[in-house]
């Protein structure tokens, strides 16, 4: 866990640290690698010690170990310290109204995350939790709009795009604009394992939304040169209360 320790001083300077946890974490599951991953809980604990507090759990490997794997990873995250926030796993449709929130320095942030697919493994009624797919735009719109009402800022993680490609596809651009229009302030893309471009989008209400289409890898065993180059997105979110009581967020 040397790499986590190396970045800890950087993370210590931030108020909030978010990461896409692309493998199931548990102390119960046997560790396994490609194509169906599971990771010892010590990995997540090392990230926690490094300063990570927000973990996105929605990606193409979420269903790798089926219902039993989901149950084990849910138990693991429930055992983590209370200041850990997870997003991207929902306990059925009745849970969709729950918006993960965190208030830091008087600023409330909502965290949502979605995935394009789960490697052909469908959601099953036997699963204790499920992801929300990017194709479920009606659900996503409801969540993002609700989050926009409840929080000062809405950060959305999206697991999308083409693996090992620096090219942003039309589906990414379309969904990014929709998310911005619905209320997202920051969109963090993952899945391609290589860097893709970033840009500002103008939302329907005039807000500016920042989207990083892919940050590449943080920690992996992939070894292509462009897979070894990842980015850490560092943003400043500012909330200003005017004398008349109105709040400006930027």
Model-predicted segments: where are they?
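Acidic, metal/ion-coordinating pockets
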Residues: 2-250
């Amino acid at each position: 866990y040397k790499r986590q320790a190396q970045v800890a001083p950087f993370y210590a300077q931030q108020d909030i640290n978010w990461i896409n946890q692309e493998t199931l974490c548990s102390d119960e599951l046997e560790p396994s690698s490609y194509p169906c991953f599971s990771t010892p809980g010590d990995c997540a604990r090392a990230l926690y010690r490094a300063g990570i507090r927000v973990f996105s759990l929605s990606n193409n490997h979420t269903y790798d170990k089926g219902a039993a794997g989901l149950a084990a990873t849910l138990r693991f995250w429930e055992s983590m310290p209370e200041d850990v926030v997870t997003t991207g796993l929902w306990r059925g449709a009745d849970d969709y109204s729950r918006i993960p929130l965190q208030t830091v320095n008087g600023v409330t942030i909502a965290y949502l995350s979605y995935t394009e697919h789960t490697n052909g493994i469908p959601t099953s009624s036997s699963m204790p939790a499920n992801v929300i797919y990017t194709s479920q735009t009606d659900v996503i719109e409801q969540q993002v709009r609700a989050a926009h009402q409840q929080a000062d800022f809405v950060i959305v993680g999206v697991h999308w795009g083409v693996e090992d490609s620096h090219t942003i596809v039309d589906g990414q651009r379309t969904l990014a604009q929709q998310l911005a229009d619905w209320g997202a302030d920051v969109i963090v893309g993952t899945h391609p394992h290589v860097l893709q471009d970033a840009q500002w989008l103008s939302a329907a209400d005039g807000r500016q939304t920042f989207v990083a289409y892919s940050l590449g890898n943080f920690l992996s065993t992939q070894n292509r040169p462009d897979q070894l180059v990842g980015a850490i997105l560092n943003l400043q979110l500012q909330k200003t209360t005017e004398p008349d009581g109105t709040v400006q967020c930027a």
